[in-house]
Amino acid sequence: MHAGGQSRRLPGYAPSGKILTPIPVFRWARGQKLGQNLLSLQVPLYEKIMERAPEKLRTLIASGDVYIRAEKPLQDIPDADVVCYGLWVDPVLATHHGVFVSDRKQPEALDFMLQKPSLQELENLSKTHLFLMDIGIWLLSDRAVELLMKRSQKDASYSDLKYYDLYSAFGLSLGNHPRIIDDELNKLSVAILPLPGGEFYNYGTSRELLSSTVTLQNKVYDQRQIMHRKVKPNPAIFVQNAEIGVTLSSNNDNLWIENSFVGASWKIGSRQIITGVPRNDWTLALPDGVCVDIVPLAEKRWVVRPYGFDDVFKGDIQDEKTLFLGMPFIGWLAKRGLTPDDVIGRKDDLAAAGICPVVEDIEERRKVLCWMTSELELAEGKKIWLNSQRLSADEISAKADLRQLYAQRESFRKGNWELLARNYEKSVFYQLDLADVAEDFHCLKIDKPDVLPSDAPQMQRIHNRMLRAEIAKLNGKDFLNDE
């Protein structure tokens, strides 16, 4: 599974990897887990595919920053060297991805593959060919894996690996009329399968984190299938593993708060992702489009990383096209009386430039964050930034204390569990995987929820008793009254 990259376009989950991004429970789903992430949602489909795959197809390659659903049963998988799954999509969407092109007379066989074709190319092909968008699920035979490894090595025997792209090099060498001539790869048999009832959700960027989650949540509008009665002020607000004291409104569009404390004295807006913020008593105003990520390091130190909602952490720091906090980075420096010489580390790539201060004191964290985002005249914030050790985005991922990050998330989740149980009428509590709920209550030492009143829906009362009994069992206590 492709994962563990730099995550330039989704900085909030770069340290742990996008594949471990926590995903909110779908409001219409049954049996999901409060602690679910992108990986746990992806794996069941891939396991089903491998169960149906012929014996010689023993390797599955998939992308780590997507969520793919199949609403219908999988078809039989042909015995080919390479089998790729695709989706029927709008041509405009296909221009941003790889595309499998098949002859209309032989739709199950790959004719050739294209990478990000133009609309004109697709229109010209549509008379004689069909096309499916590549969704990144590839099955390979041992022979195909052997050739892929061979192409990834330098010419000298037992030498180092070289850069070789699965999609733009290997993929374009496949099919009946491949775009790249390679005698060995051209001989591999290839089959293309449309994913039955397939759905594709991209989680590669900060914006897609919100847009894909909104689309998933709104897949079902039928109120009979949605157990809880909570109505959010804006459908694009997501709060999980967090404690918030602010009142959210319809103005908080595209807001994601996770593993964070947002106090009553915060002012937040729209297009914001807030991750990793420890408990605090800050007075803070975040402008629209400004995101905050606080990452724990060893020895009780924290690195402060603000960024823009659409920042990509890419490019020379002196290039006007290189953005930070939604503006040219060179302009961000100038507004604060700084020059590129004040930046630590490399200057040819923003992801490798040391711009994020490491701060121990919690109040100093607030001051430097305010100075970096909105209070340009805050002299103390500038002084802290100049005198602090500063890490690049790459260094943050390398040095993050993931144990502490996960411990903080667990602490917030414990508080969320208690709140969800108390507010069961307006929460997803009783539509979750109750065995997982019981396990979490046991591990986090949370008291079992109270017995529901007699006027609660009957199925909820049954689920309540089942859950109480299971928690008591795990705690080694009497459970017969509930069971």
State each model region's role.
Residues 1-12:
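N-terminal nucleotide-binding beta1-loop-alpha1 segment
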